Amino acid sequence: MIGSAQSVSVMTRAQLQSFHLRRYTPERMVVAAAGNVDHDGLVALVREHFGSRLVRGRRPVAPRKGTGRVNGSPRLTLVSRDAEQTHVSLGIRTPGRGWEHRWALSVLHTALGGGLSSRLFQEVRETRGLAYSVYSALDLFADSGALSVYAACLPERFADVMRVTADVLESVARDGITEAECGIAKGSLRGGLVLGLEDSSSRMSRLGRSELNYGKHRSIEHTLRQIEQVTVEEVNAVARHLLSRRYGAAVLGPHGSKRSLPQQLRAMVG
């Protein structure tokens, strides 16, 4: 649920209904189906249930293009809470899903923190046992995106977690990943993509997202070729371009002030 307790509590049924009628309209929607589906029967059902709201020949609104906006400079946010763990999230802005190096960015994310063989998992958890959880995430939208790193650890290990995390990010920004890491990351991306297609719901979601995001169907073969074409040189160029920037950060845990947070974290935010 997005919003504060106050904003949610004053929300009315009429407001929700008005929002639904204005936003959930045929020109904003795609109906996708996968499995043993009769196409003509599906079209008939859509016409039956949407009826007069359908506009003949009108396609969904074209995906938005342009450069995303970020309000203000990267900042550090602290939520002081009496908790057993410290949670930290670091993030940097990236280009959107239409970027020409989009798949190199996905390979970078996977090699950095996208699995058990990733650099962060190996250095922070496997080798040193500093954190319960550590991983990266990549969110791509029409006009911008975000590459983030999350970790959860005991408060007394927070400084060590940030020291190792900062070292990993600086190392990848400076020296890049290895050919072997690139190959493992590409294999992980390909494997996850193909395994996901074994589920009809995933196939359906992929069809709908492709139509909404790109205005056309992108085959699995097309995506696999794009991943395969990524080189370690391209990945490392993306790493130099993005990972040398200042980060935004959010911390939740038993910490009284920003001054009490690890110096490595404050230096990364700048």
What are these regions (language model features)?
Residues 121-122:
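Phosphate-proximal small/polar/acidic motifs at interfaces that engage nucleotide phosphates
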Residues 58-118:
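His/Glu-based metal-binding/catalytic segments typifying zinc-dependent metallopeptidases
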Residues 1-60, 78, 95, 104, ...:
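Charge-rich, well-structured scaffold segments of protease-associated domains
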